[in-house]
């Protein structure tokens, strides 16, 4: 049988403990709703917090990987654009050489064709030398290969440079013709240069496709990591909202229970009146 005492009100103590517990839960739920996270710090759940932090760091590092791969794409795109121009120039050079191989031409016409040929040749040098992105080129012979970031561990994606200069295509800065016979020979030389150029551009195209594919993969991997971190630490706001309402009701009842328990001491005093 419970004793009635004015020194120790066990009912009030129990009611106060329950109310404090409810208030603590309520504070936690409100914090989750305010931050949107169920794990906001290591004290909430050390193991999950550490895992989430590591995965989040990996996901964030993927931004550097994506930036590097995108630079790679742009570098190749510039080289491909220069290559398109160069193959067009080679085609026009072949046309001039073919026309100049006509032995029925007069000297003025032949010289005009030769001048056009030489001008087109010099434009190849300009196109190759200007094929740079952010000061870097894989078309002008300044580098043998470029390696871009492929993953957060620092591994790389290597692109082999394809020199599209005159030398890289089997020509020289003095490649020309002075006779119809030499012009005829030059046709074969230009055909070889064209084949070399298209082979190199095809290889760059394959590298570009590889970069595109890997960049897409990195984006999906980053999204998966972000989603995984969210699953670990994000709060279920619908669930927390329902819990908030329940705890608020429980808090109100706890306050009433504490008030009732505290009134028992007054009831004991009334017995002595």
Curated annotation (Swiss-Prot):
Q: Keywords in alphabetical order, please.
A: Bacterial flagellum, Secreted
Is Secreted found in the keyword set? yes
What single Pfam family name could you report for this chain, choosing any that match?
Flagellin_N
Localisation: Secreted; Bacterial flagellum
**Gene Ontology terms, cellular component aspect?**
bacterial-type flagellum; extracellular region
Keyword Coiled coil assigned? no
A Gene Ontology molecular-function term?
Answer: structural molecule activity
The Swiss-Prot or TrEMBL record describes its family as follows: Belongs to the bacterial flagellin family.
What biological function has been recorded for the protein in this entry? Flagellin is the subunit protein which polymerizes to form the filaments of bacterial flagella.
Quaternary structure, per UniProt, is: In C.crescentus, the flagellar filament is composed of multiple flagellins of 29 kDa; 27 kDa and 25 kDa.
Q: What is the recorded name of this protein?
A: Flagellin FljN
| Protein source organism | Caulobacter vibrioides (strain ATCC 19089 / CIP 103742 / CB 15) (Caulobacter crescentus)
């Amino acid at each position: 049988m419970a004793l009635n005492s004015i020194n120790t009100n066990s009912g009030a103590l129990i009611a106060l403990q329950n109310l404090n517990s409810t208030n603590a839960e309520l504070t936690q739920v409100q914090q989750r709703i305010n931050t949107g996270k169920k794990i906001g710090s290591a004290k909430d759940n050390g193991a999950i917090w550490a895992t989430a932090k590591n995965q989040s760091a990996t996901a964030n590092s993927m931004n550097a990987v994506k930036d590097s791969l995108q630079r790679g794409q742009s570098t190749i795109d510039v080289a491909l654009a220069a290559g398109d121009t160069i193959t067009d120039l080679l085609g026009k050079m072949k046309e001039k050489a073919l026309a100049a191989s006509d032995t029925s031409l007069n000297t003025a016409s032949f010289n005009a064709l030769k001048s056009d040929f030489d001008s087109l040749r010099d434009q190849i040098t300009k196109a190759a030398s200007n094929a740079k992105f952010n000061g870097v080129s894989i078309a002008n012979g300044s580098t043998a290969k470029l390696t871009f970031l492929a993953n957060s561990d620092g591994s790389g994606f290597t692109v082999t440079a394809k020199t599209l200069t005159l030398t890289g295509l089997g020509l020289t800065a003095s490649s020309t013709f002075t006779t119809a016979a030499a012009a005829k020979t030059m046709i074969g030389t230009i055909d070889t240069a064209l084949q070399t150029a298209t082979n190199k551009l095809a290889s760059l195209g394959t590298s570009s496709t590889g970069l595109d594919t890997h960049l897409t993969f990195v984006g999906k991997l980053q999204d998966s990591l972000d989603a995984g971190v969210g699953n670990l630490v994000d709060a279920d706001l619908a669930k927390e909202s329902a819990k908030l309402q329940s705890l608020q009701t429980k808090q109100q009842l706890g306050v009433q229970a504490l008030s009732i328990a505290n009134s028992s001491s007054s009831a004991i005093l009334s017995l002595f009146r």
